[in-house]
Amino acid sequence: MKKKNLLLMLLAVMALLLIPVSVQAAAAKPGTVKLSSIKAVDYNKINIKWKKTSGTTNYIVYYKEAGSKKWIKIKTLDNTKSSYTHTSSSKYPIVVGQKYTYTVKAYNKKTKKSGRYSKTGLTTRTVPAT
């Protein structure tokens, strides 16, 4: 009886070893976001588009007044998005007649790594109010 139980236990262990296990390779940093276009679509709205990159769970959109050194984080989007329209608000204002520069950074929530981003970004001037 002991031999039978031992044999059954041994077979069970061997069966478990044959079950495929998915192994995830160490994830690399997300790729660099390539900015496609920027356009002031109204006096208080600016649209930015980019190409998706691999290894990304989120895209983080930043803006600054042209010439400024400090990027301001304005929105975090999921990885299904490849564009964002920034609408002026009290927290993230857009002033008529000013130039604004935007950039987008790829981020991976699982690995907590960010991809490289365009430090020069894309710049546009707001359109006059009508």
Positions of predicted regions on the chain:
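Recognizes extended acidic, P/S/T-rich segments that occur
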Residues: 60-95
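Beta-strand-rich modules
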Residues: 86-115
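Residues that flank catalytic or metal-binding motifs in active/ligand-binding sites
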Residues: 57, 82, 100, 121
